[in-house]
């Protein structure tokens, strides 16, 4: 088990059939979970629900848009917590990044993460409880690193993948950026690697 993604075993990127062609709806057991927990569709893919937002706030330094190197002080909640679920009908979390670090904790199922660092380094690792084969169940993604995820087949959770995410300082969409399609991906990792990762862009 590793909270440091750099220590996690590198995994080949081999999406399952339902990742390439999503199913029309989730299995009944996962649909029941979505209904019971009142999860909603996430704009990056998958389903989510915010379960806690700290009532306490803090002043943090945030880069000003435009890459000028300037910063501004903004107010953020001290932390936020969500459930995040991938299912066979919504099996991909598209590339995005946050200014702040995000802590991830596996709850059920299996998935795979792909990280793209500002220097173009790519790291991919599997998430699960099979530690002997290099899977991880908790990990931290640094701020400024693009991350994407996709579902891996598993019987124990009906091909679902459920995690918790903690953001410190708390999540705010002003701190969140989506990858700008394949062109930005090519700029970061080159055309050959971008072609391999295009399904996550």
UniProtKB/Swiss-Prot annotation:
InterPro entries: Cupin_DUF985, RmlC-like_jellyroll, RmlC_Cupin_sf, YML079W-like. Coiled coil: none annotated. GO terms for biological process: pyrimidine-containing compound metabolic process. GO terms for cellular component: cytoplasm; nucleus. This is Uncharacterized protein YML079W. It comes from Saccharomyces cerevisiae (strain ATCC 204508 / S288c).
């Amino acid at each position: 088990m590793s909270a440091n993604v750099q220590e996690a075993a590198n995994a080949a990127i081999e999406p399952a059939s339902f990742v390439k062609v999503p199913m029309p709806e989730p299995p009944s057991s996962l649909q029941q979970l979505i209904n019971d927990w009142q999860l909603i569709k996430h704009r990056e893919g998958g389903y989510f629900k915010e379960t806690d937002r700290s009532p306490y706030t803090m002043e943090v330094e945030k880069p000003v848009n435009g890459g000028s190197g300037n910063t501004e002080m903004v107010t953020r909640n001290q932390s936020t917590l969500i459930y995040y679920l991938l299912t066979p009908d919504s099996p991909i979390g598209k590339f995005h990044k946050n200014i702040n670090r995000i802590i991830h904790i596996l709850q059920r199922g299996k998935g795979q993460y792909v990280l793209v660092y500002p220097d173009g380094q790519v790291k991919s690792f599997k998430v699960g409880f099979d530690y002997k084969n290099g899977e991880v169940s908790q990990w931290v993604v640094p701020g400024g690193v693009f991350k994407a995820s996709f579902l891996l087949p598993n019987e124990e959770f009906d091909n679902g993948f459920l995690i918790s995410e903690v953001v410190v300082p708390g999540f705010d969409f002003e701190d969140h950026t989506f990858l700008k399609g394949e062109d930005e991906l090519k700029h970061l990792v080159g055309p050959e690697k971008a072609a391999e990762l295009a399904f996550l862009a």
